[in-house]
Design a protein with these regions (language model features):
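Basic, Lys/Arg-enriched alpha-helical interface segments
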Residues: 1-72, 81-86, 93-121
């Protein structure tokens, strides 16, 4: 009888800078209850289904999009951990253009490098 592969449950973590501040959590806290619920639902889908429901941007950065009441939101994240079971939320913003702005991608890459350099805190 064949064994099923071990399932390593995914979970979201939020990047925090050296002062302990999470820009993504602050962004989410400032949203309306309805828009925050939409973002959390999209994040839950990624947690349950993996990156196949996200968009690969470049290097190790992925994007999840969701529709709020009047806006579209984007969360940039990376997979971390031994089994890539940590979904590290790096940047969040309102979608204003079709393409993800390069400045947002660079910021996510910088935050990922910072997180890794500080021992993945």
């Amino acid at each position: 009888m064949s064994q099923k592969p071990l399932h390593h449950k995914r979970r979201w973590r939020y990047y925090r800078n050296s002062r302990g501040v999470s820009p993504v959590e602050k962004f989410l806290d400032d949203l309306s209850r309805e828009d925050a619920a939409a973002v959390y639902a999209a994040m839950k889908e990624v947690r349950e289904e993996g990156t196949r429901v996200a968009h690969f941007i470049r290097n190790e950065i992925y994007e999840v999009r969701c529709h709020g009441k009047d806006r579209i939101y984007r969360i940039l994240f990376s997979q971390e951990g031994k089994h890539e079971n940590i979904l590290l939320a790096l940047e969040s913003f309102i979608k204003k253009t079709e393409k993800v702005p390069d400045s947002e991608i660079r910021l996510a890459e910088t935050r990922l490098a910072d997180w890794r350099s500080r021992g993945k805190q």
